[in-house]
A protein has these predicted regions:
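Ubiquitin-like/PB1-type beta-grasp interaction modules and other compact soluble beta-rich domains
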Residues: 1-77
Length: 78
């Protein structure tokens, strides 16, 4: 089981959430990129920060059981 949470404008892309605000998904063995494609996050924002267990990871990282994945869009101002 992997806990996944999207923030900001990406939050509506989460298929479901539990009471703790996370999507609990059977995604062990799947890459971050595959999760993003499945939930149609790809193309929603140009840049995002992806953390797994509070450490930044690339989209080819393979998720493990017990991981917590957090996805946040980068915000710019001027």
């Amino acid at each position: 089981m992997v806990k996944i949470k999207y923030f900001g404008i990406l939050k509506p892309c989460m298929p479901q959430t539990e009471d703790d605000g996370y999507w609990h998904a059977e995604k062990a063995g799947v890459t971050i990129g595959q999760v993003l494609e499945e939930t149609e996050v790809v193309g929603k924002v140009e840049n995002m920060v992806i953390l797994v267990n509070k450490v930044r990871k690339p989209t080819d990282y393979v998720l493990q059981a017990g991981d917590t994945m957090t996805v946040m869009p980068l915000v710019a101002g001027g």
